[in-house]
Amino acid sequence: MLSLIPFTVCAFLALITSKGGSATPSTISLECSENDVCAALETLTRRQDRLQKTLNLCTDDESQFTLTAVVKCTSVIQVPFPNRHFKMAALDLSSGICRALAQPVVASQAYTVSAEILNEAGWKGVNSGHPGLLFNAIDENNFDFVYLRPHSVSGCYQTGYMSAGVNKFVESKRCPNGPPKGGEWFPFSVTVNGQYATVYRSGVLVTTFKTHFASSRARGGVFIFNGYKNVILFRKFKTAPKHFFSKRCKEVVEFPAGYVKMDAGIGSWPKDAFCQVEFGSDGRIASYELKVDLYNFIGRDKANLGHPGVFFNAEDEDNYDFVYFRPHSVGGCFQTGYLLKGKPRFDGAKSASCPKGPPKGKTWFNVKLTVSNATPAGEVRVYLDDTLVTSFNPRYPIKRRGGVLVANGYKNVIYLRNFKIL
């Protein structure tokens, strides 16, 4: 807040001293020079900004990547400031993985390992090598991995795992946007959710595959292979636990803009129940409010067809209360129910019209639930764009745990943003 003061003061002084002309950056600067205090404040703020940027550069990689194990590498060195990247070389003519593992973080079944990588050299020049990320690391000899081949179009990526120090290779295919180019930085990430891993390069989905090791703690690293004269640079390595968990979804993508895509394009209804995303919460037994913005993108090739909704009072991922909406139905605008052992149940449920009609496709709408334990049976109130839609008694005990869902079997794709449990 304090950083805004000098600019506000300068702009105010410029406006009150100007001769009726419009204030521009140049006139603000000139007028402001008449006031020594304003000029001093501007200078101080600029110095603070430069200091903060320098501090961020100095601490970025060091605070997020601490080497705990380096195995079978010719060298792994950290290039000093201002470059702030690591250089890894595997020049041994024998086989085996040169690998650098990062410091373990908290236990998590969902997390992302990411880094920016540059392939500097290989046996055939800059466009040859095997830069990769490892994850689900139990130790330096047991982990899952995925790497890229800058020299191969048809075998752009390779998945696999190391078990007791022995490499096992699983799948190799093309990348949607081709192999990475040598000599250029590219973002590379693996998002782990339970026993599935999703790989992205430069923000583009490369593949999703089942892992060999179950994710119990978020630990990863960077690697290349010996025998190929491979040298890479890497920077901005991060191992970050995710704030949500998904299940029974064809695809879940988190975008930098702050919204999440959910694709419920698998199976049939009601056999495959819901594609769901659960957000981290404290799980306390207390009254709460659940809020989220939803956007029904498409369902069976129609924007106004779908079943987007929320779940709450979750005992676990297969047992919870829910309510969803039908953009395609005026008379059945909303539907309550509960999930029992992964199966949707509707005994004692409610379905009716909404006071202002169903939500529209390809339009953001807000869903709010107030979940109260003021009475022994509990009470849930459902609001659509701040209008009360219905109220009912929940099936499960009040618990501050929930997320967003969309029914499988309808090729339904939705987006969500601003999820909160208050």
Curated annotation (Swiss-Prot):
Q: Name one GO cellular component term.
A: extracellular region
| Taxonomy, superkingdom | Eukaryota
Species of the source: Acropora millepora (Staghorn coral)
Q: What are the UniProt keywords, alphabetically? A: Secreted, Signal
Where can this protein be found? Answer: Secreted
The principal localisation class reads: secreted
- Tissue-wise expression: Component of the acid-insoluble organic matrix of the aragonitic skeleton (at protein level).
- Name-wise, this protein is Uncharacterized skeletal organic matrix protein 7
Signal peptide stretch: 1-23
